[in-house]
């Protein structure tokens, strides 16, 4: 079945994409002062959806990190808006990965509008478990959460006070959260914010809310707040085995099974009576019913009918670009694909593949330690070097003047050369000197990735020497003095312990510069740092684990335990807007797999490129080069390994 989408005015599509990164960044920052934040975050979510709808015209599958980040950010904004409707509210934050910014809330908005405290709510407050939203608090994680036990903060779930019953906001937030694979993190919010069934009988939108709560979260409101009757009252036929071994009540304690979910959906639908289906909630209920029953053919028939009805409604007015993405149908198809493994039998631009599959990535060319090499990738290596292109950096397009970076470097080095400068101040500023030279290096690389640029090379030398000097001081005993050489000048500087001591992230930057430079003494200052420097505590990070593995590899001890740990942490972590370190690439060096290194290198460079397609990230100087990757490549070349990858990310003038 093929269902074409309705058309959107070209001017609206262009406007939705034009300068989007700058516009949405401004909108998110203005949310810090928005007096009506729930409405503001809904508008932010709509802007992301307009952008995605417009992009889907050029990119029908909506693949890529930019679309993934935009969808996740739309979900974050929509869920945040929903949580802001709860009274009283817990402390929480809305963070927009696409922009790298957000707002924290502590329940300070509209407190004067709260009704008087009721029994069990001293001063209008609500007891909070203290757990982050989405953490296990009475229900299990995963697809079948089991029933939430009906209490949250001392009240029946679903009966907390709300300033409004914004059912459309609830539905949009749930659909977006599911598509972005974050619904389970906000389970408590959805259950608390759901409009109650009692008093809303006959409303198809509320019926859809409760049907989705049953199917997605395994939750039903409970005998006092859910359906005003029993299945028999609606002429429904219950399977004989539905009540085997349990009381004669489908609302008894325990998880809501699929057969019960079907019964619940039938019951809410039976209360609706006759009526039209604007804006399509009845059709969505019908599609959801087939999904719950496991009726694949019926599901796709109803989904096709749902989309045809949707198109007819959309064609009747001046629709916004976001109308190209019907969230209800998309979420239902995503549930069918991700939970039941059903392929999409309805061909339509309304159902971009990446949104349905959850942005399933392509299989990597190689996995850790040279495992599972893709046959096509290995075959490609036998023909020509792999090529990874790099977009022209905005600095080059704008012909950015790099002289301010050079002037800053000259001023810093003048101070370092001056014997009258305070040695303690110079010692404390070594890491700042490294950071400034690193930025200068990246700017120069962005402007001319392949050229022979003496200023770029000078920045590399000065940055690597400054980082190594800071680490040499960090190793020394407090109260002693150490010779540090930067730019041909040696100064005797005092060692100390305190807030200016380098951290593992700065070590990572310093060792990358040292590996690119290839000076043995400079690298030694990085490698000789004590292993305890990388202690992670109770919250290991991908970056810290990578540093520990790289440190073990470079200092010649068995690196596999630390490498295994880094791979484990990297696989578990949600890096959000941060680019993960090249752990798989490092594992090829640990394994000694030359072919695997080349394959992993191509993957790492493509991952870097894709990361910087999101929003305004491409304007960042870090987009020009991945110094972690470049450092490992230079190290491999010095080991004599052939690296059959050609890319502007690997400037020939820097490779050994």
Q: Model features per residue range: what roles?
A:
Residues 1-53, 276-292, 300-447, 575-586, ...:
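Terminal, non-catalytic domain-edge segments
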Residues 29-126, 130, 134, 138, ...:
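Eukaryote-skewed repeat-based solenoidal scaffolds used as protein-protein interaction platforms
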